[in-house]
A protein has these predicted regions:
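The feature primarily captures lumenal catalytic ectodomains
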Residues: 1-382
Length: 382
């Protein structure tokens, strides 16, 4: 994307001014992103909205509507691209996940940002010292220096990227540019992203969630019978199943209660050559999770349960993400970047004010019909 300017010269900055207040809702609270930012962008080639970030082109000053005067913006790390990592203000105990890490790495690739030119910034009150992904983030983003911690956002700061702000669906230019830039060369992009992952995530024994569960793999009995009968499997459908969170986490969301039932149903209706398995990836070391993805052709899972590792799926594979209420575009972005197909399915769930959102059982028959439809669209039955 040659037309994207990360650090416009002073003479160019009049076209790229963030013209709204910066407060606690600017970062986090992703449900507020639609229509919340007032960005001036006179050049249609310059995107103001991307997945997991907003470009903010500052002239060094921010106009404050409350007191009708300009305010000086503090430069946290002059000359560097700042990645501001926040969490949803409503769920400050949420940990960062692999989607954030892979999304960040992809942003660096998308904008040709080198790690030595990055400065990572945390809000002190939204940083968890036991967050397992913090060390990975340090590895990915902090080669140019240690993270900076700021106490609050009352002071105005120059922020280049804000992680945890999802792509607005009303950004057709984003889709166009990603297609033109990456999807025309999926093999090249796929290889490049794998090189980046190998470079940054050289932590083979890192376990995603510290979950102890004996039921790591679940193969429907029907699948076992077929295997024992000599059936050769040519395709594999993997369901990521997290039925419990570790005790040190407060959230009980992103769970699939009826995983075995869904696996049994799929195994009973799909062609015999399609292997169906239910996997609790959270208790597997990272290298085993990646190995599993490389052997999967159709990946099903709840949003936030490890779907982003599907970036390691073989080319032209399928992501099928299960969500609640609205779409989050981690998987869409990464699937487009890596030459895969992506489908969403919004299901009903229950809201628990104490433990966050918990996914409940949903209609397996309806979901299976959609899986079959997507497989037919992608010639899986040939």
């Amino acid at each position: 994307m040659k037309n994207i300017i990360l650090n416009p010269k002073k003479s160019e900055q009049s076209n790229y001014i963030y013209n709204g207040p910066i407060d606690k809702y600017t970062f986090g609270a992703p449900q507020l992103n639609r229509g919340f930012f007032n960005m001036k962008c006179n050049n249609p080639q310059i995107l103001t909205e991307y997945y997991m970030m907003y470009n903010r082109y500052f002239s060094g000053w921010n106009y404050n509507y409350e007191n009708n005067k300009d305010e000086k913006i503090e430069e946290l790390a002059p000359g560097k691209t700042i990645f501001f990592l926040s969490r949803n203000q409503d769920s400050p105990n949420l940990y960062h996940g692999m989607g954030d890490v892979l999304g960040t790495i992809s942003m660096m690739e998308l904008f040709n940002i080198t790690e030595d030119n990055v400065q990572i910034v945390f809000l002190e009150n939204m940083y968890l010292k036991d967050d397992p992904y913090y060390e990975i983030y340090k590895k990915v983003l902090s080669r140019g220096g240690e993270p900076i911690f700021i106490k609050n956002l009352k002071q105005k700061y120059h922020i280049s990227f804000a992680i945890h702000v999802p792509l607005n669906w009303d950004s057709p230019v984003f889709i166009r540019d990603i297609n033109n830039t990456y999807c025309k060369h999926p093999t090249k992009t796929y290889k490049k992203l794998h090189e980046l992952i190998d470079k940054y995530l050289d932590i083979p024994n890192f376990v995603d969630s510290f979950i102890s569960d004996n039921e790591t793999f679940y193969y429907p009995k029907l699948i076992i019978d077929r295997h024992n009968s000599g059936v050769k499997f040519t395709k594999c459908l993997t369901i990521i199943w997290r039925k419990v969170w570790p005790k040190n986490r407060t959230e009980q969301n992103r769970l699939m209660q009826n995983g075995p039932e869904l696996a049994d149903k799929l195994a009973s209706v799909l062609p015999k050559n399609i292997l169906v398995r239910l996997v609790n990836t959270a208790c597997l070391p990272m290298n085993e999770q990646i190995s599993l993805m490389k052997k999967t052709d159709y990946l099903v899972g709840i949003h936030g349960a490890g779907l982003t590792l599907g970036i390691f799926l073989p080319l032209s594979s399928i992501y099928h993400e299960i969500l609640h209420k609205e779409t989050w575009n981690v998987v869409l972005f990464l699937s487009m970047m890596s030459g895969h197909n992506c489908y969403f399915d919004i299901v009903k769930g229950t809201d628990n004010k104490t433990n966050g959102f918990e996914y409940v059982s949903f209609d397996e028959n309806d979901f299976v019909e959609k899986v079959i439809k997507h497989m037919k669209e992608n010639n899986y039955f040939q």
